[in-house]
Amino acid sequence: MKLSKKSIQKAKIELVDFSNCELSTKSYEESSMKKNAIIFKDEKYLLKYMEKNKARHYQDIKNQKETYFNSVYSEYISCHIGKMIGLDIQDTIIGFEKENNKLKRIQYIPCVACKDFCKSGENIVNFERIFEIVNRKENQKYNDENFNDVLKVIEKQEFIDKNNLKENFLNMFVFDSFIGNFDRNLKNFGIIENEKDKTYRIAPIFDCASSLHPKANRKRIKFLANSYERDSQSVYEYALSPNSYFKDDNGTKINYFDFLVNNSFNYNSDIAKSIVKIVPKLIELNNNGGIYDIVDKLDGMIIPERIEVIIKELNLKVDEMFIPTLEISKELLNKEIDEFMLKDYSGFNEYNKEEKSEFLSQIKNILEIQELLVENNSNNFSTRELYRRVDNFLENKNTKDMKAVFVYLEKNDFPIDYIEHFEEKFRLEIEKSTKNKEKSNNSKEINEDEEIGKEKKFDINF
């Protein structure tokens, strides 16, 4: 749908005119959209817009009539949905640029401005580069299109805490399955490097333009809108057809619906955690009209049928894909806790350093799972019951020094609710100890008690 001065004036949101923005010297990766580095309100932005010639250049190989002309809107809608469910995702602004055509008439070119999330002295390191580094170090050749190989490289890399990076990647994967992103290649996610002190952080999610069927032309969209009216089977097939960029171990592209529902995501508890974390927020946003509000604001920029198709498709995905996979995930995570409650840890002191570290990571993971389940009213075990089990383990490791345990929990980022629980136990223990001291007339005994916490350490021997 062509923009005009009239449609811009009637738009439901303010469309920013980027025509006279100062250009920045920052350079970005080439993609299917024309890009310009600009300065807007003293901030760096990447301006992405689809020129007609550019759109033709990136035509679909199988269907020469399909282009990525609607990627501007896909980027804006997807990023705003991600922002509303609390994901760390790039900020975007929708707008236009003016230019004169051959007849010297003003054309209004739709564009989306993506805020640069790198601070001064920082640089984006995409995952393609991380793959190269790990391959060279390990003398391996991990497949950059294989989903499981990506997870292996996440485990092997040493820039970011592997658990945090894995969680971020899987959260992004679940989100991509909702927006139907078919091009989350290794250049489209990564980490940020501070070039001065060589510290690293995970980059926000960016480049969501290959989502929400950006290649579907007006004719296709109108056909789908009519199909929704008729409740046609073709609607279900089209809505659930998007594949991930990544492939399974057989070299087949992962279909999001098959992977999450039919194959139950291979009962991977890490994926289940991301599902329980992301999906309830998507369901709530869909049910309270939040998605409709985001898409409807583009009325006048995109045809009404496209608005209708996007809203109905995402609603269908909630019902057909996400509600079923959420139930599978809850069941799997409750089973994880059930197995932990029955676990025998009597041989912990005979574990080697790696085994001890792994078991304590399991405890942390179980506590995180419980938090997620409680948030969604889906926990089979009470939190008090689980905490009692964890307490029994932590307090029986050849030490009575709760202070040392407390320091360990904080240092290793255990869930805050459990840390506060343990801190309260620590406080009550101090009160009890103080009362006992007051009753005692043995000053030597008092002095010995006061040294507790200063000399003993949590007996894990890392």
Task: Please name every model-derived segment.
Residues 10-134:
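Conserved ATP-binding subdomain of kinase catalytic cores across diverse folds
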Residues 75, 147-217:
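Conserved kinase catalytic-core segment
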Residues 83, 195-347:
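C-terminal catalytic region of ATP-dependent kinase domains
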Residues 345-353, 374-383, 394-401, 413-418:
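Charged, low-complexity interaction regions
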Residues 355-370, 407-433:
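Repeat-associated, polar segments at repeat-unit boundaries in modular proteins
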Residues 430-462:
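Non-Sec secretion/translocation targeting segments of pathogen effectors
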